[in-house]
Amino acid sequence: MNADGPVVNVHVLFFAKSRELANTPRSTVDVPTEITANELLDHLVSKFGLISIRDNLILAHNESYIDNLSDRILFKEGDELAVIPPLSGG
């Protein structure tokens, strides 16, 4: 992750298997104010040990799903990021 520009602190919420692997329901991370979803995902996977579910994760920024990993995300201080693995059940 390239953090040459401005950096902000965002709140990260983990759900289901991502919560188990990260060993926490929530955390904070410093991220650039502009980053691709793919770069962000790689950073979170590395920082929180999510490699085993990386290809199945869904990210949501301020309660809006990120549909395309090539999308650029613009963060402001205190934004919220959710890390959501697919849920199963019946």
Swiss-Prot record:
PTM description: C-terminal thiocarboxylation occurs in 2 steps, it is first acyl-adenylated (-COAMP) via the hesA/moeB/thiF part of MOCS3, then thiocarboxylated (-COSH) via the rhodanese domain of MOCS3.
Positions bearing 1-thioglycine: G90
GO MF terms, alphabetically ordered: molybdopterin synthase activity; nucleotide binding
UniProt keyword annotations, A-Z: Cytoplasm, Molybdenum cofactor biosynthesis, Nucleotide-binding, Phosphoprotein
Stored InterPro entries: Beta-grasp_dom_sf (IPR012675), MOCS2A (IPR044672), MOCS2A_euk (IPR028887), Mopterin_synth/thiamin_S_b (IPR016155), ThiS/MoaD-like (IPR003749)
Localization per Swiss-Prot or TrEMBL: Cytoplasm
GO biological process: Mo-molybdopterin cofactor biosynthetic process
Domain of life assignment: Eukaryota
Pathway where it operates: Cofactor biosynthesis; molybdopterin biosynthesis
UniProt cross-references to SUPFAM superfamilies, sorted A to Z: MoaD/ThiS (SSF54285)
Glycyl adenylate found at: G90
GO terms for cellular component: cytosol; molybdopterin adenylyltransferase complex; molybdopterin synthase complex
Family assignment from sequence similarity: Belongs to the MoaD family. MOCS2A subfamily.
NCBIfam families: moaD
Assembly and oligomerization: Heterotetramer; composed of 2 small (Mocs2A) and 2 large (Mocs2B) subunits.
Note: This protein is produced by a bicistronic gene which also produces the large subunit (Mocs2B).
Function of the molecule: Acts as a sulfur carrier required for molybdopterin biosynthesis. Component of the molybdopterin synthase complex that catalyzes the conversion of precursor Z into molybdopterin by mediating the incorporation of 2 sulfur atoms into precursor Z to generate a dithiolene group. In the complex, serves as sulfur donor by being thiocarboxylated (-COSH) at its C-terminus by MOCS3. After interaction with Mocs2B, the sulfur is then transferred to precursor Z to form molybdopterin.
PANTHER family the record matches: MOLYBDOPTERIN SYNTHASE SULFUR CARRIER SUBUNIT
Entry protein name: Molybdopterin synthase sulfur carrier subunit
Species annotation: Drosophila sechellia (Fruit fly)
Organismal lineage: Eukaryota, Metazoa, Ecdysozoa, Arthropoda, Hexapoda
